[in-house]
């Protein structure tokens, strides 16, 4: 049986771009509401980004920049800079598990399972 958490029936470019956008939004805003399938896939991406942020080397900055959108936070700083300067020190003593998924009732229009994914 197929893995139900994977984003199927889409090409790899679409999948990569959706996960890039969602991961940048969760880093900037702290939490987002999305479908349960996207939240489960997004958890993997965000955990890897924060782990790269904890390393804080030039190579890890470049790898993180390649998988994030170039947007600003509410206070005007770049999302990548916010990841490395604010979020990474916050999770310095934590070994993984940086996100939490909270299940919501299904969406009204198409009965899709919804969830909130947030940083712990």
From Swiss-Prot:
Keywords: Ribonucleoprotein, Ribosomal protein. InterPro entries: Ribosomal_bL17, Ribosomal_bL17_CS, Ribosomal_bL17_sf. GO terms for biological process: translation. Transmembrane segments: none annotated. It holds the Pfam family Ribosomal_L17. It comes from the Bacteria. GO terms for molecular function: structural constituent of ribosome. One of its GO terms (cellular component) is cytosolic large ribosomal subunit. Part of the 50S ribosomal subunit. Contacts protein L32. Belongs to the bacterial ribosomal protein bL17 family. This is Large ribosomal subunit protein bL17.
